[in-house]
Every structure is written in C-alpha cells, then in structure tokens.
C-alpha cells in the first residue's frame, strides 16, 4: 500500500480509503489499487502493480465497471503522469478539473 499512499500526494482530489485511491464525479468513478506479484519465484523486490479501474454511472445511478489497466512503472512521478493521462483519455475530461 506504500505506492497508493505515495500516489495520494500526486492526486490531491482523490480519496484514500485505506486500500485504494478513489476519484468520483457525477458520471465517473476511478479506482487505483495496488496488486502484489503472487508468483512464488518472485522473491526479489519488484515494482508494484497499480490497477486503474474506470466505472461509468448508468441511468439507474449505479456505477458499472468498465475497463481497467495495470501499470508497473518504477518512477513514481512517471507512474502518476501515465495514470493521469490514461484516466483523462478514458473519461474524456481533465482529471484535475472534473474528477
């Protein structure tokens, strides 16, 4: 969860839930969560995997799961930049203004 706490500094409009970062707007919900490599042969320190899930609000008001992408970038600054770019292209809005 260290990477999620670190990413919180890059995304001040997000909400930290204890195990994920969540961005929410009237029409979208975006969730960032860290996943560990569960391979038994992976005893070496590896770059964490951050999964970004995008949900769109349906007509009934529920958020429906859409697409997701896994990011595994060593540099936290570059990781944050690529996640922000992915979210902006996914929802078609500027992350800092609308979500």
Regions found by a protein language model. Give the residues of each.
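Surface-exposed polar/charged interaction patches
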Residues: 10-17, 38, 86-89, 93
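A short, structured beta-strand/loop element
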Residues: 33-59
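Negatively charged, low-complexity tracts enriched in Asp/Glu with abundant Ser/Thr
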Residues: 1-29
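A structural detector for beta-sheet-dominated domains
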Residues: 24, 33-35, 53-55, 74, ...
